Amino acid sequence: MLSIIQRVNCAKVVVDNQKVADINKGILALVCVEKEDTQQNFEKMADKIIKYRIFEDDAGKMNLSLVDIDAEIILVPQFTLAADTKKGNRPSFSSGCPPEIAKEKFKEFENIFRRKYNKVQTGIFGADMKVFLTNDGPVTFSFKI
């Protein structure tokens, strides 16, 4: 399981000219499930994202988590994170899941995330999404579990 999280001042996801997710200060998380991912991976990733301290405290130190500041998050399914880019000039997606399995796994991850934290919005799996965000920093982290 892979994720790239970005601290944002605001973010939104648009599909077919319709806004499907919209947050103010929080996190935009690009999320990729892989073939071997299990519920344990989903639990660990959700905990990592929720508890990771990327927001500044009063002293200006990154010491506060999503929970600490009661912020929102958008989970965006992003299969291209699984691309193997080591050879050639075209990405390979051999470690990614077939779409129907990946959709189920992403939904399972979303459900686990929602059980742990309630201020969650999502993009739409398989849709052509337009993702708009204003980075705060920028502050970006990459996770592999």
UniProtKB/Swiss-Prot annotation:
Subcellular location: Cytoplasm
Keyword field: Cytoplasm, Hydrolase, RNA-binding, tRNA-binding
Broad class of the protein's primary localization: cytoplasm
Single Gene Ontology MF annotation: D-tyrosyl-tRNA(Tyr) deacylase activity
Disulfide linkage: none
Reaction(s) catalysed by this chain's protein: glycyl-tRNA(Ala) + H2O = tRNA(Ala) + glycine + H(+); a D-aminoacyl-tRNA + H2O = a tRNA + a D-alpha-amino acid + H(+)
Residues in coiled coil: none
Keyword Hydrolase tagged: yes
Keyword Coiled coil included in the entry's annotation: no
InterPro entries: Daa-tRNA_deacyls_DTD, DTD-like_sf
Domain remark from Swiss-Prot or TrEMBL: A Gly-cisPro motif from one monomer fits into the active site of the other monomer to allow specific chiral rejection of L-amino acids.
Similarity remark: Belongs to the DTD family.
Protein role: An aminoacyl-tRNA editing enzyme that deacylates mischarged D-aminoacyl-tRNAs. Also deacylates mischarged glycyl-tRNA(Ala), protecting cells against glycine mischarging by AlaRS. Acts via tRNA-based rather than protein-based catalysis; rejects L-amino acids rather than detecting D-amino acids in the active site. By recycling D-aminoacyl-tRNA to D-amino acids and free tRNA molecules, this enzyme counteracts the toxicity associated with the formation of D-aminoacyl-tRNA entities in vivo and helps enforce protein L-homochirality.
Protein name: D-aminoacyl-tRNA deacylase
Source organism (scientific name): Francisella tularensis subsp. holarctica (strain FTNF002-00 / FTA)
